Regions:
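Short, low-complexity disordered leader/linker segments with a strong preference
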Residues: 1-32
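Beta->alpha turn/N-cap motifs
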Residues: 95-101, 159, 188, 205-210, ...
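Periplasmic-binding protein-like
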Residues: 150-154, 273-288
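A conserved helix-loop-strand patch within extracytoplasmic ligand-binding domains
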Residues: 116-157
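A ligand-binding cleft/hinge motif common to bilobed small-molecule-binding domains
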Residues: 99-109, 171-175, 201-236
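C-terminal lobe and pocket-closing loops
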Residues: 125, 139, 210-277
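Single conserved hydrophobic/aromatic residue that forms the stacking wall/gate
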Residues: 291-300
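N-terminal (or domain-start) structured segment
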Residues: 27-116, 154, 161, 177-201, ...
Length: 300
C-alpha cells in the first residue's frame, strides 16, 4: 500500500478523537485519588512537554481525580500503548496518543488499533519541521531534493521506524521520487541529539522542540509541513511552496482503555476541553508553535 494511503488510514482514526463527549453530567465514581496519563515516550519530548502542561492546567482547574503523567518509553511508543490497552477500564488510566499508534500497526510492529481505546478528546495539532544539521550543504527542501537525486539512498534521515517521524520522510520520498537512508531513534530527544551532533543529516522535529535551536543557528529548518507558513517563523517556506506536496501534522489526543464507561469518558472530555480552551494555556502553546484543536461536541 502506498505511504500516502497508509497515512490517510491512520489520520482517519485520529479524526475520531475530535468527537469528544462534553455533555454535563455528575462526576462518576473513579476508584483512585490520582489517575495516570501514560505518555509512551521519555521525558522532554514534544508529547511529554505538551501533556505535562495540559495536566498541570487540568489539575489547577480542580480535576477529580488529579492526573499524573507517567512516562512509559521504549519500542518507539509501543510499550506504553500496550500497557495502556491492557489497563483496567475504570478511569484510573488514560493514554496520550497520536498517529504512531496506527502507523506502527501498519508496519507490523504492534497489533493494537484505535479499536483498543475509547476516544476522549483531540488536544493539539503540530506541523513538522524538516530539520537538517547546520553543516549540511542544503538550505531548503528544493536543494535537499536535488542533492538526494544525485546520491540516492545516502543522505541519512533520523526517525523512529514505523512512527510519524519516519513517515514524514516517506511522504517526502513519495512526493519527490528521492530515497533517503533511514536511521531509527527511540524518540525526539535521541533524534535531536543525533541531529545536533551531525550523526545524521536530517530529522523530523516537532516545532516545540526545534524552534530554540533554529533561532540559535544550531539547526537548519528546510521547510514546514503545514499548508501555510507559520507566523512564528514566517521566513521558513512550506514544503508545498518548494514543490513537495507534503502536508502533515502530528495529531495528539487522549484515550482510555476499551470498555471505559461513557460517563467516565464524558467526565474526562469536559476536563480536557476546559484546559484546552484556557487562554493562558492556548497562549503558551501558541508560543511553542502548537495549535490547539477545539473539541467537537456530538450534540452540535
Amino acid at each position: 500500500m502506498p505511504i500516502k494511503n497508509l497515512l490517510k488510514a491512520s489520520l482517519a482514526g485520529a479524526a475520531l478523537l475530535a468527537l469528544s463527549f462534553t455533555g454535563a453530567s455528575a462526576a462518576p465514581s473513579i476508584p483512585c485519588g490520582t489517575a495516570k496519563l501514560i505518555v509512551p515516550w521519555g521525558a522532554g519530548g514534544g508529547t511529554d512537554v505538551i501533556f505535562r502542561q495540559m495536566v498541570d492546567k487540568v489539575n489547577k482547574n480542580g480535576a477529580k481525580p488529579q492526573l499524573q503523567v507517567v512516562n512509559v518509553g521504549g519500542q518507539g511508543g509501543n510499550k506504553g500503548a500496550k500497557q495502556a490497552s491492557k489497563a483496567k477500564p475504570d478511569g484510573c488510566t488514560l493514554f496520550a496518543i497520536h498517529q504512531s499508534a496506527i502507523t506502527s500497526y501498519f508496519t507490523g510492529r504492534i497489533d493494537i488499533t484505535w479499536d483498543a481505546f475509547e476516544t476522549i478528546s483531540m488536544v493539539t495539532s503540530t506541523p513538522s519541521i524538516i530539520g537538517a544539521n547546520v553543516n549540511t550543504p542544503y538550505n531548503n527542501i528544493s536543494e535537499l531534493v536535488a542533492a538526494a537525486k544525485k546520491a540516492p539512498g545516502t543522505i541519512t534521515a533520523g526517525g523512529t521506524f514505523g512512527s510519524t517521524s519516519q513517515f514524514v520522510f516517506l511522504l517526502l520520498e513519495d512526493a519527490t521520487g528521492v530515497k533517503f537512508k533511514h536511521v531509527s531513534y527511540d524518540g525526539t530527544k535521541q533524534r535531536m541529539t543525533a541531529l545536533l551532533a551531525d550523526n545524521i543529516k536530517l530529522g523530523e522535529i516537532n516545532l516545540a522542540a526545534a524552534i530554540k535551536f533554529i533561532k540559535a543557528g544550531k539547526l537548519k529548518a528546510l521547510g514546514v509541513t503545514n499548508d501555510a507558513r507559520l507566523d512564528q517563523i514566517p521566513d521558513i517556506k512550506t514544503a508545498q511552496e518548494q514543490g513537495a506536496n507534503v502536508i502533515f501534522a502530528v495529531e495528539r489526543g487522549v484515550v482510555a482503555p476499551k470498555g471505559t464507561s461513557a460517563e467516565i469518558v464524558k467526565h474526562y472530555a469536559k476536563m480536557f476541553e476546559g484546559a484546552a480552551m484556557d487562554k493562558d494555556f492556548k497562549a503558551a502553546m501558541h508560543l511553542s508553535l502548537i495549535h490547539i484543536s477545539e473539541p467537537t461536541r456530538q450534540d452540535r
